[in-house]
Curated annotation (Swiss-Prot):
Post-translational modification: Late in virus-infected cells, may be cleaved from a 56-kDa protein to a 53-kDa protein by a cellular caspase. This cleavage might be a marker for the onset of apoptosis in infected cells or have a specific function in virus host interaction.
InterPro entries attached to this UniProt entry: Flu_NP
Motif position, Bipartite nuclear localization signal: 198-216
Disordered as annotated region, ranges: 1-22
Stated role: Encapsidates the negative strand viral RNA, protecting it from nucleases. The encapsidated genomic RNA is termed the ribonucleoprotein (RNP) and serves as template for transcription and replication. The RNP needs to be localized in the host nucleus to start an infectious cycle, but is too large to diffuse through the nuclear pore complex. NP comprises at least 2 nuclear localization signals that are responsible for the active RNP import into the nucleus through cellular importin alpha/beta pathway.
One Pfam family here: Flu_NP
GO MF entries: RNA binding; structural molecule activity
The protein's name in its UniProt record: Nucleoprotein
Annotated compartments: Virion; Host nucleus
Length: 498
C-alpha cells in the first residue's frame, strides 16, 4: 500500500476534505483540533469549572460525551419517538467532579442538547464540524481499546479470543465516517460483517425490499473497506467472493473468520492517529496557541509535543497505581493498545507493562462508586522520543507478507522484526475443515507458512528526539527479542460492556 494514488490521507478523512496539499491539511486538522479546544474552554466557563477541575480527564470525557450525544441525530430521533419516563430526550448530561473542602465530589449535570450544539458550532466558526466529533469518537475508541479486552464479543461471533489484536476501533459508533473506517482493525470489520450476515440468516426480510437494498449497499461497502485493509491479492480476492455472494450465509462467515485468522500473520493496513482528550486541546488554546496558524498533524510530532507540556489529572481509586493509570491513558492517546510493548517502552522511555500487570481499572468512574475515598493524581503523559504513526500492518518492502504476532498491530513506524508464534497461529487453521476450499485459501496458507519472523519490518524507520521536529535523524532502536511484546498477553482485563 505504498502508493497513495487515489487514497485520501488520514487527515483528509479526518477533516472531510478533498485532496489538499500538506500545508492545507495541517491547517484544516489544526482548525479541527483548535475548535475542540475552544469548545472545551467555553464548557468550562459554562459549568464554572476551576482550572484544576477543567484538567480532570473524567470531566473532559463527560463533556466530550455530552456533545457527541447532542449531535447523535439517529438516537435523538429515536428518543423523541419512544419517550421513556423520567428522561428528557432534549437533554443530556453526566458526572462532573468538583473539588470541595479538600475532597472530590460528584455532581450530575443536565444540559440542553440544542444549547450544546450552539456552543459547539460557535467554537467551530458556525459549522457543524463533524470531523471534530469523529476525532472525539476515535479518542474514546482508543481509550476503550487500551482498557478493555473484547474476548466475549469475539467468542459471540465465533472468532478466537486470541485475535484481540485485530479489534481496534470495535467500539466506534456506526456514524464515525471515513476517518472511523480507517482506524478499524480487520477483526472489527469481520465482526460487523458477521453480525450482519447472521441477521440476514435469521430474518428473512433483512435483504428484501427497499430497506434490504440499502442494507445490501452497506454490506458491500463494508466488504470493500475490509478488502482495502488487506495487502495480499489472495486475501482481496476472497473478499470479492464474500462481497459478491447472492445470499450471504455460513460459507461467508467461515471465509471471514479464515481471513481474520490469516491477518494475524498477513497483517492488514490499519490507520493509527493520536487523538487527545479535549481538555489537552483546551489547555493549549487557553495558553494562546493558534492551532490553525501553526498547523497540526495527528500522525507526527504534534500530539507528542502537546503532551510534553500539558498537565492532566485523573481521579484514582484507593487501590489503583497512578503510574499504571498514566500508562493506560498514554497508550490511548497514541492509539498504541496493540503495539509491541518493546516499541512503546522505547518511545515512552519507561517500561510499558502488559494489561494484566496493571493495577488500574478504566478511567471513567461509575455512578455508584464511593467518592469519599477518591484521590486525584497527575497523569504522566510525556515521552522520551516520538515516532510517526503507521497505517501499514508492517510488511516488508518486498511486498512479501512478513511476520505479524498473535498480538501486535503496529502503531508506530519503527524498524523491528515482529516475533510471532507461527505454530500457535497455524494450529488455528487445522481445526476447521468447513468453508470452501479454494486456490485462494491454499495460497493464503502457503504465504503464512513461508513468512519468516526474522524479516524486518519498517526497514530503516526509527524514532526521533523531541527536538527533531523535521524527523531528520532516525534512531533505530534494537530490541531484546526474548521479550513477549503483546499487551493483552495472558490477560485478565475487564470486558467492555456497552
Amino acid at each position: 500500500m505504498a502508493s497513495q494514488g487515489t487514497k485520501r490521507s488520514y487527515e483528509q478523512m479526518e477533516t472531510g476534505g478533498e485532496r489538499q496539499n500538506a500545508n492545507e491539511i495541517r491547517a484544516s486538522v489544526g482548525r479541527m483540533v483548535g475548535g475542540i479546544g475552544r469548545f472545551y474552554i467555553q464548557m468550562c466557563t459554562e459549568l464554572k469549572l476551576s482550572d484544576n477541575e477543567g484538567r480532570l480527564i473524567q470531566n473532559s470525557i463527560t463533556i466530550e460525551r455530552m456533545v457527541l450525544s447532542a449531535f447523535d441525530e439517529r438516537r435523538n430521533k429515536y428518543l423523541e419517538e419512544h419517550p421513556s419516563t423520567g428522561r428528557d430526550p432534549k437533554k443530556t448530561g453526566g458526572p462532573i467532579y468538583r473539588r470541595r473542602d479538600g475532597k472530590w465530589v460528584r455532581e450530575l449535570v443536565l444540559y440542553d442538547k440544542e444549547e450544546l450544539r450552539r456552543i459547539w458550532r460557535q467554537a467551530n466558526n458556525g459549522e457543524d464540524a463533524t470531523a471534530g466529533l469523529t476525532h472525539l469518537m476515535i479518542w474514546h475508541s482508543n481509550l476503550n481499546d487500551a482498557t478493555y479486552q473484547r474476548t466475549r464479543a469475539l467468542v459471540r461471533t465465533g472468532m478466537d479470543p486470541r485475535m484481540c489484536s485485530l479489534m481496534q476501533g470495535s467500539t466506534l459508533p456506526r456514524r464515525s465516517g471515513a476517518a472511523g473506517a480507517a482506524v478499524k482493525g480487520v477483526g472489527t470489520m469481520v465482526m460487523e460483517l458477521i453480525r450482519m450476515i447472521k441477521r440476514g440468516v435469521n430474518d428473512r426480510n433483512f435483504w428484501r425490499g427497499e430497506n434490504g437494498r440499502r442494507t445490501r449497499i452497506a454490506y458491500e461497502r463494508m466488504c470493500n473497506i475490509l478488502k482495502g485493509k488487506f495487502q495480499t491479492a489472495a486475501q482481496r480476492a476472497m473478499m470479492d467472493q464474500v462481497r459478491e455472494s447472492r445470499n450471504p450465509g455460513n460459507a461467508e462467515i467461515e471465509d471471514l473468520i479464515f481471513l481474520a485468522r490469516s491477518a494475524l500473520i498477513l497483517r492488514g493496513a490499519v490507520a493509527h492517529k493520536s487523538c487527545l482528550p479535549a481538555c489537552v486541546n483546551g489547555l493549549a488554546v487557553a495558553s494562546g496557541y493558534d492551532f490553525e496558524r501553526e498547523g497540526y498533524s495527528l500522525v507526527g510530532i504534534d500530539p507528542f509535543r502537546l503532551l510534553q507540556n500539558s498537565q492532566v489529572f485523573s481521579l484514582i481509586r484507593p487501590n489503583e497505581n497512578p503510574a499504571h493509570k498514566s500508562q493506560l491513558v498514554w497508550m490511548a492517546c497514541h492509539s498504541a493498545a496493540f503495539e509491541d510493548l518493546r516499541v512503546s517502552s522505547f518511545i515512552r522511555g519507561t517500561r510499558v507493562l502488559p494489561r494484566g500487570q496493571l493495577s488500574t481499572r478504566g478511567v471513567q468512574i461509575a455512578s455508584n462508586e464511593n467518592m469519599e475515598t477518591m484521590n486525584s493524581s497527575t497523569l504522566e503523559l510525556r515521552s522520551k522520543y516520538w515516532a510517526i504513526r503507521t497505517r501499514s500492518g508492517g510488511n516488508t518492502n518486498q511486498q512479501r507478507a512478513s511476520a505479524g504476532q498473535v498480538s501486535v498491530q503496529p502503531s508506530f513506524s519503527v524498524q523491528r522484526n515482529l516475533p510471532f508464534e507461527r505454530a500457535t497461529i497455524m494450529a488455528a487453521f487445522t481445526g476447521n475443515p468447513e468453508g470452501r476450499t479454494s486456490d485462494m485459501r491454499t495460497e493464503i496458507i502457503r504465504m503464512m507458512e513461508n513468512s519468516r519472523p526474522e524479516d524486518v519490518s519498517f526497514q530503516g524507520r526509527g524514532v526521533f528526539e523531541l527536538s527533531d521536529e523535521k524527523a531528520t535523524n532516525p534512531i533505530v532502536p534494537s530490541f531484546d527479542m526474548s521479550n513477549e511484546g503483546s499487551y493483552f498477553f495472558g490477560d485478565n482485563a475487564e470486558e467492555y460492556d456497552n
